[in-house]
Curated annotation (Swiss-Prot):
This is Putative membrane protein insertion efficiency factor. Keywords: Cell membrane, Membrane. Belongs to the UPF0161 family. PANTHER family: MEMBRANE PROTEIN INSERTION EFFICIENCY FACTOR-RELATED (PTHR33383:SF1). InterPro entries: Membr_insert_effic_factor_YidD (IPR002696). It is a peripheral membrane protein. GO terms for cellular component: plasma membrane. Pfam families: YidD. SMART domains: Haemolytic. It is found in: Cell membrane.
């Protein structure tokens, strides 16, 4: 049941990307965009936990926010942005994929 609900939620985000977001100029301050963040969170953590992370991301995306790189956390935590132990997951200047490639060199 949760897998089908997750698929419906991802379908809703993809519909938004194709029909609404495609017709407006890009304006998201974060990388990845809020809709891509939502899809990744839903795929990684499922409908409930991924949905919570997606809503929290939308609440962070406001006109007075700094923006930046804000990846889905590696371990689920609603409070990961406020935890000193997870400071390595704060928004970075380079994407996670680039950082991993450089570490392998």
């Amino acid at each position: 049941m949760t897998a089908s609900f997750k698929a419906v939620m991802i379908g809703g985000v993809r519909w938004y990307q194709q029909h609404i977001s495609a017709n407006t100029p890009p304006c998201c301050k974060y990388y990845p965009t809020c809709s891509n963040y939502a899809i990744e969170a839903l795929e990684r953590y499922g409908a409930f936990k991924g949905g919570v992370l997606a809503v929290l991301r939308l609440l962070r995306c406001r006109p007075w926010s700094r923006g930046g790189i804000d990846d889905v956390p590696q371990r689920y935590s609603v409070f990961y942005r406020f935890s000193w132990s997870k400071a390595h997951e704060e928004p970075r200047l380079t994407p996670l994929a680039t950082t991993q490639r450089e570490a392998q060199r």
